[in-house]
């Protein structure tokens, strides 16, 4: 960022830079590796699924809070999962897409909180939820706090059962 963070223009420039970093959270090498396996990235999958220009993302600037095992040095925006809503053939849906290019798509505390948030949104809005799974499982570096979100996710799966459609796409490794 080259602008003055103490000015409105500088703050806007800083926000734009952060949002751009969130879009490219996975390293170039990780993206190339994903593509070499014939797989799309999380955002590419969303863009291929929803109507063009309809996706609204939330919490793209969320980052993990862990300081164990040197994790404070690697805090990518989005924390490895993209969440939001869009339309498919004009029908509104909520969705999450796990990003294998960011920490192997591993589920940590913030990652799980984001999935829970979009699940709650889908249930409240009464719209289908689509989960695109491509994950290395629990983010073990975060210890037991990475396991708690699984229970919250499963609780919401049960609460949503028979109320809203829940669709899971397994497009890579998946735990659970």
Question: What is the meaning of each model-derived region?
Answer:
Residues 1-167, 173-175:
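Terminal-region recognition feature
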């Amino acid at each position: 960022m080259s602008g003055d963070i103490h000015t409105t223009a500088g703050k806007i420039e800083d926000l734009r830079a952060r949002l751009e970093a969130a879009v490219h959270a996975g390293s170039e090498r990780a993206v190339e590796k994903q593509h070499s396996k014939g797989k799309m990235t999380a955002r590419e999958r969303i863009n291929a699924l929803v109507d063009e220009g309809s996706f609204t993302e939330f919490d793209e600037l969320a980052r993990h809070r862990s300081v164990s095992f040197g994790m404070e040095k690697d805090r990518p925006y989005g924390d490895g999962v993209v969440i939001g809503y869009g339309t498919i053939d004009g029908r509104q849906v909520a969705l999450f897409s796990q990003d294998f290019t960011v920490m192997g798509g591993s589920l940590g505390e913030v990652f799980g909180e984001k999935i829970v948030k979009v699940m709650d949104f889908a249930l409240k809005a009464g719209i289908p939820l689509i989960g695109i799974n491509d994950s290395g499982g629990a983010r073990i570096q975060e210890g037991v706090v990475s396991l708690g979100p699984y229970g919250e996710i499963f609780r919401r799966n049960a609460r949503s059962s028979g109320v809203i459609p829940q669709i899971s796409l397994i497009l890579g490794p998946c735990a659970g």
